[in-house]
Design a protein with these regions (language model features):
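Short basic helix-loop element that most often maps to the first helix and adjoining turn
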Residues: 9-28
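Short, Lys/Arg-enriched C-terminal cap helix and immediately downstream tail that follows
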Residues: 14, 48-49
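Conserved hydrophobic/aromatic packing and binding residues within compact polymer-binding modules
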Residues: 11, 25-26, 36-39, 66
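Residue cluster at the C-terminal edge of the helix-turn-helix DNA-binding motif
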Residues: 28, 46, 57-58
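DNA major-groove recognition helix of helix-turn-helix/homeodomain DNA-binding modules
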Residues: 50-65
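Recognition helix of helix-turn-helix/homeodomain-like DNA-binding domains
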Residues: 31-46
Length: 68
């Protein structure tokens, strides 16, 4: 599995661990809901570092954790 595929999977797993819906997570992170769903479903395989930083901050993890 490539890191591109793992990003969406990891974002979803960390979000679920926090008990956040996609909508709530999108609002808290400042990332558009549609962008978040595309990341989690691997439509967007390479999100920008800016978006990754926003997601990682709310999830309480590093960007590196999201790409492992």
């Amino acid at each position: 599995m490539t890191s591109e595929i793992k990003i969406g999977k990891n974002v979803k797993e960390y979000r679920n661990k926090l008990g956040l819906s996609q909508e709530d997570f999108a609002k808290k992170s400042g990332v558009k809901y549609t962008t978040l769903t595309k990341i989690e479903s691997n439509v967007i395989k390479k999100p920008s570092v800016f978006i990754m930083a926003k997601l990682a901050k709310i999830l309480g993890v590093s960007i590196e954790d999201l790409i492992k």
